[in-house]
Amino acid sequence: MILILLISFYGVCNARNIRTTSYHVTIHKKAGNHKKLKIILLADLHLGYNIGCSQMKQMVMKVNQQSPDLIVVAGDIFDNEYDALDDPDQLVKIFRQLKSQYGVYAVYGNHDIDEKILAGFTFGSGREKKVSDPRMDEFVKRAGMKLLRDESVVLIKASISMEDQMLRK
């Protein structure tokens, strides 16, 4: 029992730490006149029970310091339940402070849709149609993110494409 409590405590504390990792990727394709494109990838935000306004303010500040060309939010924006957000309107204002030349694009992950999850893992047949909470959809829109659902977007004669397996019919 003590081990479980210690592991849970470690997980909660670790979730609040913002980690950055830099990668330099060479792609042998033309992207307009761009020689370099700085893309910031945010993943597994899990807004709600453990992550709120304070952590997001720090994250937005770190992202904006990098002067990205593009910001991509790669799923698990929410921690399963919209009602877990401590102050949705304030979080929207914080997200709207993200700055990039080509905008902020997002896809949903398994924690952003109506799916059976136990201890962070998805279970079930996988055959059911996955739907998102309309309040989450509205939050993402108000936050200034373009939600991609099995679609691609052309940026500077280069394209970004993100498949959303969770919402595929």
Feature map (PLM): residue ranges:
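Non-catalytic terminal accessory segments
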Residues: 1-16
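Extended recognition/assembly regions associated with phosphoester-bond processing machinery
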Residues: 9, 23-27, 66
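Alpha-helical transmembrane signal-anchor/signal-peptide segments
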Residues: 15-30
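Soluble catalytic domains of enzymes that build or remodel membrane lipids, polysaccharides, and related
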Residues: 33-169
